[in-house]
Regions:
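PLP-dependent amino-acid enzyme catalytic core
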Residues: 1-156
Length: 156
């Protein structure tokens, strides 16, 4: 079975412009005597891209199939995953909440600023343990359900 056939059985939300290009790196290739290429997944079009939008295409399709109207995730204060989940939710008209670790060095800049600007509900908790973040995010899902929302938790 080809990978395309295996993936075709899962619902997918179109969030990326793919395939992304490969750029030949002539100087590095010359230095090592090998052909080096750089995969430009930063060009997927979703909030500075990367590999995470590819995963989110499947996660969000599952959420939509279940009727979700709210996405919930967690991560560090400068989480790329939180930024991309927020961007995807907003692109699709869904509400979004992110549970992020609060540390003494965080500032409202970079990914955290972007998440705020995109209108995510942001909850900061003091922890260095990812499982604390996930537990808080799952509790937030229960809270949102009690408010009549249909949240879907997206793991990191």
């Amino acid at each position: 079975m080809k990978i395309e056939e295996a993936l075709a059985q899962y619902p997918k939300e179109d969030l990326t412009r793919t395939p992304t290009p490969l750029h030949f790196l002539p100087h590095l290739s010359e230095d090592f005597g090998l052909n080096f290429y750089l995969k430009r997944d930063d060009l997927t079009d979703l909030a500075l891209g990367g590999d995470k939008p590819r995963k989110l295409e499947y996660e969000i399709a599952q959420a939509k199939a279940k009727g979700a109207d709210y996405l919930v995730t967690c991560g560090s204060a400068q989480s790329n995953h939180a930024r991309l989940t927020t961007a995807a939710a907003r692109h699709l008209g869904l509400d979004v909440a992110v549970v992020l670790s609060h540390d003494q060095w965080h500032a409202i800049q970079g990914n955290l600023l972007t998440v705020y600007l995109m209108g995510a509900r942001v909850e900061m908790i003091h922890t260095e343990d990812h499982w604390d973040l996930e537990e808080h995010a799952l509790a937030l899902c229960d809270e949102l359900k009690a408010e009549g929302k249909k949240p879907h938790y997206i793991p990191v």
